Swiss-Prot record:
This is Large ribosomal subunit protein uL29. The keyword Ribosomal protein applies. Keywords: Ribonucleoprotein, Ribosomal protein. GO terms for molecular function: structural constituent of ribosome. InterPro entries: Ribosomal_protein_uL29, Ribosomal_uL29, Ribosomal_uL29_CS, Ribosomal_uL29_sf. It holds the Pfam family Ribosomal_L29. One of its GO terms (biological process) is translation. GO terms for cellular component: cytosolic large ribosomal subunit.
Length: 65
């Protein structure tokens, strides 16, 4: 997910996306622990997507464009 796509979302959509990504991260960590993960790079992608969403939300909170 690109930052441009994230910026086009509303705050509610971002919060929903954040919850979705956190749940996916939880499931991926569980798969790593049990040795069933198919794509280990997805873990890194999800963590970075979470960081992007949190950054955009914080920018909006501080009114930074």
């Amino acid at each position: 997910m690109k930052a441009k796509e994230i910026r086009e979302m509303t705050n509610r959509e971002l919060e929903a996306k954040l919850d979705e990504l956190k749940e996916e991260l939880f499931n991926l960590r569980f798969q790593v622990a049990t040795g069933q993960i198919e794509n280990p790079m997805r873990l890194k992608q999800v963590r970075k997507d979470i960081a992007r969403v949190k950054t955009i939300l914080r920018e909006r909170e501080l009114n930074i464009s």
